[in-house]
Curated annotation (Swiss-Prot):
It comes from Arabidopsis thaliana. The keyword DNA-binding does not apply. It is found in: Cytoplasm, Cytoskeleton, Microtubule organizing center; Cytoplasm; Nucleus; Cytoplasm, Cell cortex. PROSITE patterns: TUBULIN. This is Tubulin gamma-1 chain.
Length: 474
């Protein structure tokens, strides 16, 4: 029986990457732009109903909600090639259409105002599922709608569907360049608090690294948003491939995440993908082997998290867990030999308090999508260097807060009324504690970390270190 997943696309960025994801899924399952199964799609063996359901006339509809506070991106989808794919009852655009003005507080407050309408949509989708496993949220953490309204939805889902998994694909801003959004550090910090407390798994999509990969690996001089979004959709579709083409293991979300996330708060994952190609390179074919793919996945240049985070204090940084999803016709003995070679050459530095092994899931490729390579791979990994990404968010926040800059934008909303800025302080404490926990993971004594300090043991929304999240327990 399929375990269904409902996708929530929130804000401009969330809807853009969500749109690319559905395009990719339609290609892989042989579904047309109108949701009709193509005549050539006769092979079967795939689980379309994890992400799609069928209407009365048998055409496929995504289990997706498209949510935004301003209409531009959703209007583009409704007038585009895939306009007949979605259920139009599951599209929400705010009546005023004014957006959130890149202000987290505005997005959060407006989310509260339309909670009933959006939760009705979610409840309807959930009721239409036979065995709902969880939710996937696509959003950005830097703007207003994806961060603020996304945060409110995370809290609400955690409350309403407490036993269901919540995974996010969260786009982190380019922290190495000056942003158009001056309040980006505030928005990012407030969203990170919710991602820490209310999500079970966060796949970090770092704009800095996506841009670098597009330039260095795909040889694009000035990569467009469409091209970086295409990279994101590749990661999203590859990370769900074992759910859609099930094998013996990792064929549901809980199985996928349980092995990757040994402690509840360290649930931020980085990704790597190889080989990457663009259309004009498709005629350049090289030999791909399992060992070649698995070695490349460990190279910093293929990791979709900023190199400054990966390289800072690199000698101390360690992998907490790795899952490689290998797609293609692969002999399991090749996997075993590749793992042995990687172990012999000590290419991976694991934590000392957990199992020091790379897990591998083998998955079929879609028979309907022709690629130039025989084997491709996605790495999902928990790595302690991710803390430098959060530290950067903290330092950028501290600079703004020290100057008391732009806080009036937030004081207009109830959460920050009467100059009550405790939400900022609490968010900062939680993210600082998260950074400390990732640092502690590098120590062999991590299992004892926090036990002697009762204040660090989280209650209610979070869990203490070392406690297995009940949603991820078998």
């Amino acid at each position: 029986m399929p375990r269904e997943i409902i996708t929530l696309q929130v804000g401009q960025c969330g809807n853009q990457i969500g749109m690319e994801f559905w395009k990719q899924l339609c290609l892989e399952h042989g579904i047309s732009k109108d949701g009709i199964l193509e005549d050539f799609a006769t092979q079967g063996g795939d689980r379309k109903d994890v992400f799609f359901y069928q209407a009365d006339d048998q055409h496929y509809i995504p289990r997706a909600l498209l949510i935004d506070l301003e209409p531009r991106v959703i209007n583009g989808i409704q007038n585009g090639d895939y306009r007949n794919l979605y259920n139009h009852e599951n599209i929400f655009v705010a009546d005023h259409g004014g957006g959130a003005g890149n202000n987290w507080a505005s997005g959060y407050h407006q989310g509260k105002g339309v909670e009933e309408e959006i939760m009705d949509m979610i409840d309807r989708e959930a009721d239409g599922s036979d065995s709902l496993e969880g939710f996937v949220l696509c959003h950005s953490i830097a703007g207003g709608t994806g961060s603020g309204m996304g945060s409110y939805l995370l809290e609400t889902l955690n409350d309403r569907y407490s036993k269901k998994l919540v995974q996010t694909y969260s786009v982190f801003p380019n922290q190495m360049e000056t942003s158009d959004v001056v309040v980006q550090p505030y928005n990012s910090l407030l969203t990170l608090k919710r991602l820490t407390l209310n999500a079970d798994c966060v796949v970090v999509l770092d704009n800095t690294a996506l841009g670098r990969i597009a330039v260095e690996r795909l040889h694009l001089t000035n990569p467009t948003f469409a091209q970086t979004n295409s990279l994101v959709s590749t990661v999203m579709s590859a990370s769900t491939t074992t759910l859609r083409y099930p094998g013996y293991m990792n064929n549901d979300l809980v199985g996928l995440l349980a092995s990757l996330i040994p402690t509840p708060r360290c649930h931020f994952l980085m990704t790597g993908y190889t080989p990457l190609t663009v259309e004009r390179q498709a005629n350049v074919i090289r030999k791909t082997t399992v060992l070649d793919v698995m070695r490349r996945l460990l190279q910093t240049k293929n990791i979709m998290v900023s190199s400054y985070a990966r390289n800072k204090e690199a000698s101390q940084a360690k992998y907490i867990s790795i899952l490689n999803i290998i797609q293609g016709e692969v002999d399991p003995t090749q996997v075993h030999e590749s793992l042995q070679r990687i172990r012999e050459r000590k290419l991976v530095n694991f934590i000392e308090w957990g199992p020091a092994s790379i897990q591998v899931a083998l998955s079929k490729k879609s028979p309907y999508v022709q690629t130039a390579h025989r084997v491709s791979g996605l790495m999902l990994a928990s790595h302690t260097s991710i803390r430098h990404l959060f530290s950067k968010c903290l330092s950028q926040y501290d600079k703004l807060r020290k100057k008391q800059a732009f806080l009036d934008n937030y004081r207009k909303f109830p959460m920050f009324a009467d100059n009550d800025l405790s939400e900022f302080d609490e968010s900062r404490d939680i993210i600082e504690s998260l950074v400390d926990e990732y640092k502690a993971c590098e120590s062999p004594d991590y299992i004892k970390w926090g036990m002697e300090d009762p204040e660090q043991l989280m209650t209610g929304e979070g869990n203490a270190s070392g406690v297995v999240d009940p949603k991820l327990a078998f």
